[in-house]
Each structure stands twice: as structure tokens, then as C-alpha cells.
Design a protein with these regions (language model features):
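Serine-dependent carboxylesterase/thioesterase catalytic core
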Residues: 95-96, 120, 140-241
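Conserved alpha/beta-hydrolase
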Residues: 113-130
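Short N-terminal helix/helix-N-cap motif within the alpha/beta-hydrolase-1
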Residues: 102-104, 130, 201
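Second-shell loop/turn segments in exported
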Residues: 97-101, 132-139, 225-227, 289-295
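Extracellular/periplasmic catalytic domains that process cell-envelope and extracellular macromolecules
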Residues: 84-88, 114-115, 156-157, 165, ...
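C-terminal catalytic-base region of ester-bond hydrolases, centering on the histidine
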Residues: 248-337
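Alpha/beta-hydrolase active-site loop signature
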Residues: 99, 127-129, 197
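Flexible, membrane-associating and regulatory peripheral segments of lipid-active enzymes
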Residues: 2-116, 320-327, 333-337
Length: 337
């Protein structure tokens, strides 16, 4: 859930430009769908990048690097020779957001988890054939891709269970795998960063788009199916949370921000079911005004992830100021180069 689409079309009038931006923003923020134990016949296998690349300081740096290195993977991630040890017995599988990749969303956090002693894996899911950016297609099918990848990781590492960390669409997609596709027995801890748990209204833009005949169909074609699936009240969101937003046997943790630019009201990030813990960045560090777009590049958030996955060994997160709106310019530029 990454791209902000800023319409540069001319001659369409202000109304058309505003609608284009509104629907694009509303869609780009929300992503997720259903995962399955078996991958649908004829659906392309997920791309698994293995060309290790350096950590980046922000989304733009990762996008620029990927332009010349489309198979880039976060350093140390997808080492299928990695053997989990007694201190870190469960592999960690990362799931990127919309219009993104394993590298653009995890170039910073991935290596930190590797350095902490975890076996870490990440796929590029939900892309069209030949795509260089992913997480744009039907999330249900993406979840099927993810399920197959979890099976591969468990088989290769001989791990009974894994931990999952999903960002934005990746949070909902992985939660669908856990809750709806029978993935719970294979998962110990699920972590959702900037999770659009109950979708978003994008400061009122989503309800407006939902009232305009054909607007969401246009959005699916111009932005992506996955984006539109995560608007508050969409059929996908209703399906995902029907019967409760958690299932027994899995530890659930969300990490969100009060100033998330894409998920408003921010309370839509929180899970309500048994076994859920909801961490708000500003409750732990009031000076950190990280929002949606900087979430996976905020060192404090990375420290929170380590704390959740390895509470006995992770250092205490260090609170440092982060300015409101950090990361937005980089995402806008990165989405238009």
C-alpha cells in the first residue's frame, strides 16, 4: 500500500483530477485478501528474490536501487540454507504492501532481523507476469501464493511454525492466510505494521467514491484490484473479519500510528479479538510522528518488531523524534519515476 498517484493529466478539469487522486489514494492504502493452502492452477508462482542488496534509509533509496537491480532482496533474506537455532527457532516471513516488493519495503528491517539471529524470508507476491512491482492483484490469489511460500520455508528449514510480519496490505493478506485458509497451526506470532485491519475511509474519500457509480471499477483498472479491496466496508474486508478478527492459537500484534496518512480513523488498525495486542507508536514514543509511509523505515518501529519477536534478547527501543509527514515526498517521487 505504497503508491500515491498524483494525476498529471491535463484537460480533464479539476473535478476529474480530484476524483483521480481521491480514488487512487483511497485504493492505494488498503490491501489484503485471502490465502490458501494450495496455489490456484495457472496462477504464477511468487517471485523469490535472492540477489542481496544493501539496506536503504528510505523507500526512495530502495526504489532507485531496484530500477537497476530488479531481483534485489534485503541483505541476508531468503537464505534457504539458514538453520533456525534454539534462541530463534521460528523463521520470520515478511510480506510487503501494495505496489511494492520485498526489497522496497524490507531493505531496512530484513537485515536487522537477520543480524539478530533469525532466518528471514520474503517473497514478491501479487504481481502480473514480468512485473517489477507487486501487491497489485487480487489478494485472495496472493494469499494462495503466500501459503505455498510458507510451506516451502517450513519444509526447507524443518520448522514446525513460523512468525509473520506484514506491512499494510501484507498484514491483511497474511491474516487471511492465518484466519481463513487454515494457516493458524503453522503460525506462532503474526505482526501487522500499519495494518488496514478494518479498512480505511481516507479522510472521507472512500465513502464518496463508493457513492459514485462505477468509481471503484475505474479505480480497479487504473490503480489495482488489491487497493480497492481494502476500503472500509468492502466485500473483502467484511469477509476477512467475519466471525472475529483473530483465531485461537496465534499471538497477534499490531503496530500502528495515530497519524497514519492512509488508515483513518487510525482505530481501524486495531484488532479486537482474543489474543490481540495493539501497540501505538506514539504511546511508546510521543515524539515519533511516523505515519504510514515511513513505518518500515523507522528505526523505532524496527526495534518494536524485534521486541515482539524476541522479547528476551531485544534491546529497549530508543525513542527519537520523527517529523510529521516523514516519508511522504520519497513515496511520491518513487511512485512516479
Amino acid at each position: 500500500m505504497k503508491r500515491i498517484l498524483w494525476s498529471a493529466r491535463r484537460g480533464g478539469g479539476l473535478g476529474r483530477r480530484v476524483l483521480t487522486v481521491a480514488v487512487a489514494l483511497a485504493g492505494s492504502v488498503l490491501l489484503g485478501t485471502v490465502a490458501g493452502v494450495a496455489q490456484p492452477a495457472g496462477y504464477p508462482a511468487p517471485a523469490v528474490p535472492t540477489e542481496w542488496a544493501p539496506p536503504q534509509a528510505d523507500h526512495l533509496g530502495a526504489v532507485l536501487y531496484m530500477k537497476d537491480h530488479p531481483a534485489a532482496a534485503p541483505r541476508g533474506v531468503n537464505d534457504f540454507g539458514c538453520v533456525p537455532d534454539a534462541d530463534h527457532p521460528r523463521p520470520v516471513i515478511l510480506a510487503h504492501g501494495t505496489d511494492a516488493s520485498a526489497y522496497t519495503d524490507w531493505s531496512a528491517i530484513g537485515p536487522r532481523l537477520v543480524d539478530a539471529g533469525f532466518c528471514v524470508f520474503a517473497l514478491n507476491y501479487g504481481g502480473k507476469p514480468g512485473a517489477v512491482s507487486f501487491g497489485t492483484e487480487d489478494i485472495v490469489l496472493s494469499a494462495h501464493q503466500f501459503a505455498a511460500f510458507v510451506d516451502r520455508v517450513r519444509t526447507t528449514t524443518r520448522a514446525a511454525r513460523v512468525d509473520l510480519v506484514g506491512f499494510s496490505q501484507g498484514a491483511n493478506m497474511t491474516r487471511y492466510y492465518v484466519n481463513k485458509l487454515g494457516g493458524a497451526p503453522a503460525v506462532d506470532t503474526w505482526v501487522g505494521l500499519a495494518s488496514p485491519t478494518y479498512g480505511g475511509v481516507m479522510y472521507g474519500l472512500v465513502p464518496v467514491a463508493q457513492q459514485i457509480p462505477g468509481a471503484l471499477t475505474v479505480a480497479e483498472k487504473t490503480i489495482s484490484v488489491a487497493a480497492v479491496q481494502q476500503a472500509q466496508g468492502s466485500p473483502f474486508m467484511q469477509e476477512l473479519n467475519a466471525g472475529g478478527d483473530t483465531v485461537p492459537g496465534v499471538r497477534y500484534v499490531t503496530i500502528g500510528s495515530r497519524v497514519d496518512e492512509m488508515i483513518q480513523p487510525f482505530e481501524n488498525i486495531a484488532l479486537h479479538g482474543p489474543g490481540a495486542e495493539n501497540i501505538v507508536v506514539q504511546d511508546r514514543c510521543p515524539a515519533d510522528l511516523t505515519g504510514h509511509f515511513h513505518m518500515v523505515y523507522d528505526p523505532f518501529v524496527a526495534q518494536l518488531v524485534l521486541e515482539v519477536l524476541d522479547p528476551e534478547r531485544a534491546p529497549e527501543p530508543v525513542c527519537r523524534p520523527v517529523a510529521l509527514g516523514t516519508g511522504i515526498p520519497q513515496v511520491i517521487i518513487g511512485g512516479n519515476i
